[in-house]
């Protein structure tokens, strides 16, 4: 094992630049450099000598030629995988299940990878059969071969440092992988919440800026009653803050781990002290409240927490998409639409219509929301498809939610920086719309009564005359009293 030699074309170890989105599973690698031979229970394979991954990774590369979206494209997952391996090594060292020097070396190598080293060695596609076994085995191989290198041995010389006996000690894919997936999602969720807070504040800032801009509110796309543009934008911030609370509440739930459960939750091959020690070390390494699940068999078979997170992300995406619908509608025009607000011009909007500018930022956020909705449907189906003591479909759950987290985070950022921060109000147009709207008559009902208000509203619609003038002409109020009643703070019930 580990002997290096040269061979002809080797089996396919990766995907070529041209086979995404359509991959040709019969394609072979053009690699002709030095290789080493590794063996497993199925036989032997030649592995590129310089690769840190090994035979289990090579088999998975051949078995799952589905996508070029490799594990290396999910740095949060790579970082989470090695954090879990660190916690396992520290727990094994504590209980005497592994030599202290080996445990320390695992921790050292994992820290290198956590800080960005060897991420390009995580070559497997994120979608795979086997409930994540290939990902776990590949991680073990990369850590073991880097450890061998640091010890002065040849990669693949597993007699000195073994991917399973050492790196995977006291673990199964069925506890190490789901714990890593949860941790990766928490990493992504923390970043999402940071951007979410900034976007929420951006809407509230606009609410303060537009506090004195009166407009007509609408229900069912029909003119309703006056409000301020500031109230409208502040409401956007409020609805986002509610989602922030719901998403934040999920983090402690994600920190319930089944480490120590091993294969199905019975803890076979793991010392009885390992589970608590592993969770404790993971909590110390991450600063997160990781604890051991009270029922490890249930925790190994159940994936409901992923559906909770995905559903909450969908809720946040749908609500933000509705806000983007409003931004597009309020900015429609510029001459023949609502034209109440101006979105920052980001790029030319047409190859045939000069001067056209489209609301491209809200549009892309809408599309992210559509994708998140689809991802949630995928997660729901995958969670339902679990059988007996394990759900085999966590890889698609992981890829779906991690993509949703990343895309939503990016959409929050671009919406804030490239749209919300630069929105301006068309104050003159809004004032003219308020002056010509019959909706303001509602504000005068306490003075003139409903019946008189209804008559004047009908007259205004028939003649086009402003409500203000009709009220004065009817002798019901003076211009001064009408203007006082139509002050922004009274129209919007915001004070005064």
Which residues does each predicted region cover?
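Conserved, well-structured ligand/cofactor-binding cores
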Residues: 2-496
């Amino acid at each position: 094992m580990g002997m290096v030699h040269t061979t002809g074309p080797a089996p396919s170890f990766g995907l070529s630049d041209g086979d995404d989105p359509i991959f040709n599973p019969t394609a072979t690698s053009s690699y002709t450099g030095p290789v080493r031979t590794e063996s497993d229970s199925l036989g032997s394979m030649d592995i590129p000598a310089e690769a840190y991954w090994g035979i289990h990774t090579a088999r998975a590369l051949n078995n799952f030629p589905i996508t070029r979206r490799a594990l290396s494209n999910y740095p949060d997952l790579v970082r989470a995988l090695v954090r879990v391996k660190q916690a396992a090594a520290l727990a094994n060292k504590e209980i005497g299940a592994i030599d202290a020097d080996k445990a320390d070396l695992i921790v050292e190598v994992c820290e290198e990878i956590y800080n960005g080293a060897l991420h390009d060695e995580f070559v497997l596609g994120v979608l795979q059969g086997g409930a994540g076994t290939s990902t776990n085995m590949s991680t073990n191989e990369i850590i073991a071969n880097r450890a061998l290198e640091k010890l002065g041995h040849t990669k693949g010389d597993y007699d000195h440092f073994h991917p399973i006996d050492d790196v995977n000690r006291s673990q199964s894919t069925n506890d190490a992988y789901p714990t890593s997936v949860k941790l990766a999602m928490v990493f992504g969720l923390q970043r999402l919440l940071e951007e979410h807070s900034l976007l929420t504040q951006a809407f509230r800032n606009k609410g303060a800026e537009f506090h004195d801009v009166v407009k007509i509110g609408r229900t069912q796309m029909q003119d309703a009653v006056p409000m301020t543009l500031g109230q409208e934008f502040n409401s956007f911030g409020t609805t986002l803050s509610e989602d922030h609370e719901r998403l934040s509440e999920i983090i402690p739930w994600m920190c319930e781990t089944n480490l120590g459960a091993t294969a199905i939750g019975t803890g076979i091959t793991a010392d009885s002290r390992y589970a608590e020690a592993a969770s404790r070390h993971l909590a110390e390494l991450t600063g997160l409240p990781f604890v051991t699940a009270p029922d490890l068999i249930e925790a190994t078979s159940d994936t409901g927490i992923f559906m909770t997170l995905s559903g909450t992300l969908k809720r946040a995406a749908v609500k933000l998409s509705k806000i983007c619908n409003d931004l597009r509608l309020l900015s429609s025009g510029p001459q023949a639409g609502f034209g109440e607000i101006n979105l920052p011009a980001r790029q030319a909007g047409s190859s045939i219509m000069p001067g056209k500018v489209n609301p491209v930022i809200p549009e892309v956020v809408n599309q992210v929301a559509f994708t998140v909705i689809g991802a949630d449907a995928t997660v729901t189906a995958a969670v339902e498809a679990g059988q007996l003591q394990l759900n085999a479909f966590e890889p698609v759950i992981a890829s779906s939610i991690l993509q949703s987290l990343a895309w939503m985070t990016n959409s929050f950022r671009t919406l804030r920086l490239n749209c919300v921060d630069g929105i301006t109000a068309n104050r003159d147009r809004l004032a003219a719309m308020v002056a010509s709207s019959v909706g303001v008559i509602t504000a005068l009902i306490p003075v003139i009564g409903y019946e008189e208000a209804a008559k004047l509203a009908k007259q205004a619609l028939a003649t086009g005359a402003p409500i203000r003038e009709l009220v004065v002409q009817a002798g019901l109020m003076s211009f001064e009293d009408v203007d006082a009643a139509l002050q922004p703070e009274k129209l919007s019930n915001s004070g005064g």
